[in-house]
Swiss-Prot record:
BP term (GO), one: translation
Similarity remark: Belongs to the bacterial ribosomal protein bL31 family. Type A subfamily.
One annotated Gene Ontology cellular component of this protein: ribosome
GO molecular function, one term: structural constituent of ribosome
Gene: rpmE
Matching PROSITE patterns: RIBOSOMAL_L31 (PS01143)
InterPro entries (UniProt xref): Ribosomal_bL28/bL31-like_sf, Ribosomal_bL31, Ribosomal_bL31_A, Ribosomal_bL31_sf
Top-level taxon in the UniProt lineage: Bacteria
Transmembrane spans: none
KW Oxidoreductase (keyword) present: no
Subunit description: Part of the 50S ribosomal subunit.
Name of the protein described by the UniProt record: Large ribosomal subunit protein bL31
Length: 75
């Protein structure tokens, strides 16, 4: 393999939505950085069966505003 072409693989801290913390190895950030999850297997609708709107930064509102005029017309 070629030398010095691979990213640095180091230990980081993961904090899940319920506050659980664990260490893993990743190329994310710098050694010792913390990755705080917005959604994880304990809170994801695909695994919990619950529907919820995840509007990060107003993306849903932005979409609705942009496409408000498009849709089926009422008769």
């Amino acid at each position: 393999m070629k030398a010095d072409i691979h990213p640095d693989y180091h230990e980081i801290n993961i904090i899940m939505t319920d506050g659980t913390e664990y260490k893993t190895r990743s190329c994310y950030g710098k050694p010792g950085d913390t990755l705080r999850l917005d959604i994880d297997p304990k809170s994801h609708p695909a695994w919990t069966g619950q529907q919820r709107v995840l509007d990060t930064g107003g993306q849903v509102a932005k979409f609705n505003k942009r496409f408000a005029g498009i849709g089926a017309r009422k008769k």
